[in-house]
Amino acid sequence: MTTTTADHNISAQQKAVEENLVNRVLQSFDACENPRLKQLMESLVVHLHDFIRDVRLTEDEWNYAIDFLTAVGHITDDKRQEFVLLSDTLGASMQTIAVNNEAYENSTEATVFGPFFLDDAPEVELGGDIAGGAQGQAAWIEGTVTDTEGNPVPNARIEVWECDEDGLYDVQYADERMAGRAYMHTDANGDYRFWGLTPVPYPIPHDGPVGNMLKAVGRSPVRCAHLHFMVTAPELRTLVTHIFVEGDPQLEIGDSVFGVKDSLIKKFEEQAPGTPTPDGRDLGDQTWARTRFDIVLAPGA
C-alpha cells in the first residue's frame, strides 16, 4: 500500500526504507479474519506512519507522547475519564458524531456525550426538579419530542444532566451525592417538562495532562454553558445532544470540545421575582428562567 508524506528532501533510499516498514506492518494483518478490524488497523497504521514521516517525529517527541498517554491513563478512574477529555478537546469525539449522525431532514443535531454521564440517575415525574440540592438559578425547561414527520413520541426516555452554579458536576464532589441529573418519560403527547438550573460555563478538568496540553497550545479549557440530553425511543435514533445558552460570552470565545451548533443555542428568558411559574411553584424573591427545546428524533437504523 502506497502512502504519502510531505517532501522533506529525503533521499530515495530513505524513503524506500520507510515505505518498506509501512508495508511490512500492513502485511502483518493479512491473517486477520475480521474484515472491519483489519480495515481499522491498516488505516490506523497508514495514517500514524504518515504523521511520523510528515513531521519527522523525533525519538524524544515520541517518548514524550508515550509518557503523555500513560499519564492520561493514570489519572483516569471511575469518576474521571481523561481519555474522553482528550478525544473531546482534539475534536475526535465531534468528528465521530458527525460521521455517525448524518443530518436527516429536520432532526435535532447531536453533540458530544461528555465524561460525566451516570447510568443510575433517579427518575423524576414530569414537572419535577432534577437539581437535587445543586445550587443555581432555577430554570423551567419544556418541550415536545416528535419524529421527523411531526408525530409525537410518547414514553420517550429523556436523560438530563448538568453542572451547578460553580461549574461542578455531582461526581466532582467528594460526598458522592447525586444532583443535577435525572430521567423522565414524555407523556402521551410527547411533551416533557422539568425544573433544572440555568446552565453556566465551566472549565473541563484541566489539572491533568489534557489541561497541560491545552495550556501549552494556548487554548481555553472552558466549555460553553450547556445542559445535556440523551433521548431514546423504540425504532428511532438515540439522540445525545445539549442546549446552549443564548448570550453566553463563551460562545464568542469558543467551546473547548467543539460541541456548539447554532441550532442548539436557546434563549433562557429570565423572569423577575414573583413572576408566576408554570406549575405554581413558589420561588420567593428569586429570579428564574425558562426555555423551550423541542426535539426531533431521526428514524432508527
UniProtKB/Swiss-Prot annotation:
It holds the Pfam family Dioxygenase_C. Keywords: Dioxygenase, Iron, Metal-binding, Oxidoreductase. Involved in resorcinol degradation. Catalyzes the conversion of hydroxyquinol to malelylacetate. Also shows weak activity with catechol, 3-methylcatechol and 4-methylcatechol, but cannot use 4-chlorocatechol, 4-nitrocatechol or protocatechuate. It comes from the Bacteria. GO terms for biological process: catechol-containing compound metabolic process. GO terms for molecular function: 4-hydroxycatechol 1,2-dioxygenase activity; catechol 1,2-dioxygenase activity; ferric iron binding. The lineage of its organism: Bacteria, Bacillati, Actinomycetota, Actinomycetes, Mycobacteriales. Its cofactor is Fe(3+). Binds 1 Fe(3+) ion per subunit. Gene3D superfamilies: Aromatic compound dioxygenase. This is Hydroxyquinol 1,2-dioxygenase. The keyword Nucleotidyltransferase does not apply. It is an enzyme of class 1 (oxidoreductase). It catalyses: benzene-1,2,4-triol + O2 = maleylacetate + 2 H(+). It comes from Corynebacterium glutamicum (strain ATCC 13032 / DSM 20300 / JCM 1318 / BCRC 11384 / CCUG 27702 / LMG 3730 / NBRC 12168 / NCIMB 10025 / NRRL B-2784 / 534). Its EC number is 1.13.11.37.
